[in-house]
UniProtKB/Swiss-Prot annotation:
UniProt superkingdom: Eukaryota
MF terms in GO: ATP binding; ATP hydrolysis activity; ATP-dependent protein folding chaperone; unfolded protein binding
Protein name: T-complex protein 1 subunit gamma
GO CC term, one of those recorded: chaperonin-containing T-complex
UniProt family annotation: Belongs to the TCP-1 chaperonin family.
GO BP terms, alphabetized: chaperone mediated protein folding independent of cofactor; protein folding
Binding partners and assembly: Heterooligomeric complex of about 850 to 900 kDa that forms two stacked rings, 12 to 16 nm in diameter.
Cysteine pairs bridged by disulfides in the record: 371-377
Organism in which the protein naturally occurs: Saccharomyces cerevisiae (strain ATCC 204508 / S288c)
Protein's gene: CCT3
Chain positions with N-acetylmethionine modification: 1
Chief location bin: cytoplasm
Amino acid sequence: MQAPVVFMNASQERTTGRQAQISNITAAKAVADVIRTCLGPKAMLKMLLDPMGGLVLTNDGHAILREIDVAHPAAKSMLELSRTQDEEVGDGTTTVIILAGEILAQCAPYLIEKNIHPVIIIQALKKALTDALEVIKQVSKPVDVENDAAMKKLIQASIGTKYVIHWSEKMCELALDAVKTVRKDLGQTVEGEPNFEIDIKRYVRVEKIPGGDVLDSRVLKGVLLNKDVVHPKMSRHIENPRVVLLDCPLEYKKGESQTNIEIEKEEDWNRILQIEEEQVQLMCEQILAVRPTLVITEKGVSDLAQHYLLKGGCSVLRRVKKSDNNRIARVTGATIVNRVEDLKESDVGTNCGLFKVEMIGDEYFSFLDNCKEPKACTIMLRGGSKDILNEIDRNLQDAMAVARNVMLSPSLSPGGGATEMAVSVKLAEKAKQLEGIQQWPYQAVADAMECIPRTLIQNAGGDPIRLLSQLRAKHAQGNFTTGIDGDKGKIVDMVSYGIWEPEVIKQQSVKTAIESACLLLRVDDIVSGVRKQE
């Protein structure tokens, strides 16, 4: 008898077959259970200490998972889910994780006890996905993007589950205002639908300033910089400034390579210094030729240049971030110039109404405000402490993402678990028409969809068993808009209760959840390399 050949490294752990699948499903469930209490308006907060000793207080699914350190590969893939959801649509991160975990949990018995091949389960899940998206489409309704009241209600539904609910009115205004500001009309698409570009990441800047009250926050029709003018004598208040944006240093240009100069006479030395000064003077004269009243550069400004520009009646800001400079260009209509020699009259921005420097707390901030038709903006957030501001910032990002999604595809689904319940009831009906073993995993998706309304009831402290059967009965009669009031844990009609969510978010969360479940079911071998213990 030949000795067994060991080809795997002994220090590696390896799980195969059923064992691997069970371990994956357990890990996915564990992640889902951590997040489960963070769904709905009565959500709990999680308090996390990151390795640096910083504190994170949040109930945003994505923010929590980002901070948790996970070892299991399946759990890591769950974290990726919430990230995808966050980048794609910005909201619904918690829903995705709970759904994916629940679908896997519902499929587990068929996989382990009934020994159904994973591929058959996956086929059924894919079929369920197509049908589920169909149902979501049926229960959704179009929305008028220009109707501010309706839009605010919508954003409120997204914010309602977050920490900022105390100031939800204010936050809705901020988010809607900001998104409307950066909305850029690109004409019409091929199908003749309106086409917008809304880039929140690049053109909406959130400046968090501790102190003051949250209600003091506002959207600036312009840009706010944490800078002061470079010279104390420069004007700190300019109405209708003429803005010049530069991407070059205003100091003496040194050659790229090293140069040696031999000096014979003493006057030559003075001449060299003079040339340096003349060069700086020439640069400043070229700038002042277009009569600017505000010069902003991404690089440094030498003392001499400050002196000349001050004499020319010009305020200067230096070392501004590239991203900020782009925003200033969008709001003032100026063009960023890389060489002073190339400055033209058309590069000067005149759309800004007011430049002023204010002291907030103990720092100076420069405002470029009251711009005409700005295509970028800054949200100035005030609040008690840094932790509160960070949480408000996260929630505001979600709210803006919601507003953006609706503008890009104006269609709404009922919230409060109503959409999920409708999908669940419809899938359960269809499962009865399927033949063979496929109907079990198909039914599993239907059962899994119920976990969203169930979790909402549990988080609000209601009785899940009684309420769920009532809800199921309502949906079976065709009331698709019936869902859970997450505050009181009662059954309400979403039309009168007024909680609607963008259809994109619902579709994306179902897609992501089912596809990730399929992915994890396909795995039948996990090899984790263990580092050699020192």
